[in-house]
């Protein structure tokens, strides 16, 4: 996934647009002719993913995007963000999906073995990308996802401000809402594609005014993993968890 000229566009060869329930406000991610998800290769079944935030140069790479990744320190320094702020925005992005569906994220004990890596691009390009590595599930409708990477361009300016960026002083530069972009890219890693130009968090048109998952986003993630066991699947507003 790439953000360019105000729009989010898929920047990959193999991530094809899947024609799955677009009329319901979501589209499932199709790879090699199969929809993809974590956990059991069956719709409506939950999953748990370990994650790690990359701290420095990494040998890990994606199969299409995020081919060279590194730690987020340069990104934080350029945007004037602390590690605590970054962790809070990431927790809020995870929380959007956890509050809607039976999906759970937990810190990996061994970062090298994490299911999902959060990193910066070592060769900065675009704004943000997601990479998904599928594992064959024996000809079923779904292929299981084996690995995911989200990588952000450290040369862009990132904001951890609560609420839309409207009214924020702009000094000849464009800021991207870290929480929004992380949540969007995580949505790809979970198995969702772009359903439409606008209106959903997973839509490809960037909108810093969205405050959480929209009805189509929720319908899509629930179709993949079932509803959250803790909360009802209703549109939610992401909370700022920094400092907790």
Model-found features: residue ranges?
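Bacterial N-terminal signal peptides that target proteins for export
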Residues: 1-8
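Bacterial N-terminal signal peptides
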Residues: 9-16
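Zinc-dependent metalloendopeptidases
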Residues: 19-244
């Amino acid at each position: 996934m790439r953000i360019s000229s105000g729009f989010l566009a898929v920047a990959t060869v193999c991530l094809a647009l899947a024609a799955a329930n677009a009329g319901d406000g979501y589209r499932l991610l199709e790879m090699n002719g199969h929809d993809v998800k974590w956990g059991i290769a069956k719709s409506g079944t939950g999953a748990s993913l370990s994650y790690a935030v990359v701290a420095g140069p990494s040998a890990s790479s994606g199969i299409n995007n995020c081919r060279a990744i590194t730690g987020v320190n340069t990104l934080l320094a350029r945007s004037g963000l602390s590690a605590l702020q970054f962790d809070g925005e990431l927790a809020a992005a995870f929380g959007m999906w956890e509050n809607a569906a039976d999906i759970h994220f937990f810190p990996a004990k061994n970062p090298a073995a994490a299911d999902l890596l959060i990193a910066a691009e070592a060769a900065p390009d675009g704004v943000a990308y997601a990479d998904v590595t599928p594992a064959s599930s024996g000809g079923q409708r779904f292929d299981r996802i084996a690995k995911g990477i989200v990588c952000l361009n450290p040369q862009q300016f990132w904001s951890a401000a609560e609420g839309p960026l409207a009214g924020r002083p702009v000094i000849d530069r464009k800021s991207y809402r870290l929480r929004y972009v992380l949540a969007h890219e995580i949505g790809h890693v979970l198995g969702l594609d772009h359903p439409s130009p606008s209106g959903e968090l997973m839509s490809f048109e960037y909108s810093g005014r969205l405050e959480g998952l929209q009805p189509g986003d929720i319908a899509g993630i629930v179709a993949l993993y079932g509803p959250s066991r803790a909360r009802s699947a209703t549109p939610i507003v992401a909370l700022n968890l920094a400092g907790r």
